[in-house]
Amino acid sequence: ARHLWSGGDDGQGSFDYQGRQFAVRGRLDVPPLPQGHPIIIQAGDSTQGREFAARSADAIFTRHGSLAEGQAFYADVKARLPKYGRAEHDLKILPGVGFVLGDTPEEAAERHAEVRRQQVSLQTAIVLLEQLWNRDLSGFDPDGPLPDFDPDVSATTVAKGRTRQHDDTLATARQWRELSRRENLGIRDLIIKVTGRQQFVGTPAQVAEDMNRYVQQNASDGFILVPHLIPSGIEEFVD
């Protein structure tokens, strides 16, 4: 693809590719892009995804729940770049983040709690738990405790049409159980806590300060805003 974006074999879009899996010959019928090639964004936090991003991407769309987690991810990915002959500025770390604004911190916190409960219904909580456990958990009470048995890691690596998001499923399950016991969380409340992307909650001034802190302290190079309502959420943020 990069070869085609660069003008092909003759600089005019011609190509003749012979590969292991397929062969193709022809001419690209669109002019070369002024910027050379489209921006390549890799999405995901897996080890394979990080390596692909370090090798080939311009930006990585990620998610993490705290400043410390963001800094660890940032350092890990940036450290992979030199072996591919790339500098730190060649790859931008852009976590997807939500935000909830209020005239006061208390109002923002109240709005945030309501938004999260709307996002994670009783049924959704069970479905998200099934994606980790790789089992049918439809008989479990969403407000009850987590399963006392381990996830099924012997079968497929895809649950409910989605690939697994965790490199170590059993370790993640243990962490969730520990968090559930420590904070006395039922399934739904736990899922609300562990599945939410990074949220900036507060007054506009507080949110701006927090976002700047993440950039200045090497947890991100910027952000991809993910409002809970579109388009009104973006409009609220801009205003």
Residue positions per predicted region:
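Short, conserved secondary-structure transition motifs
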Residues: 91-107
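Internal, glycine-rich beta/alpha segment that forms the wall or movable "lid"
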Residues: 1-56, 81-90, 98, 126-158, ...
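Structural preference for beta-strand elements that scaffold enzyme active sites
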Residues: 39-41, 59-61, 90-94, 221-224
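Generic long, charged, amphipathic alpha-helical segments
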Residues: 177-210
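A conserved active-site cap/scaffold subdomain adjacent to cofactor or substrate pockets
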Residues: 54-66, 110-112, 125
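C-terminal structured "cap/appendage" subdomains that terminate the fold
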Residues: 211-239
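Short, acidic/polar
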Residues: 42-52, 203-217
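C-terminal helical cap(s) of enzyme catalytic domains, especially alpha/beta-barrels
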Residues: 1-2, 70-79, 231-239
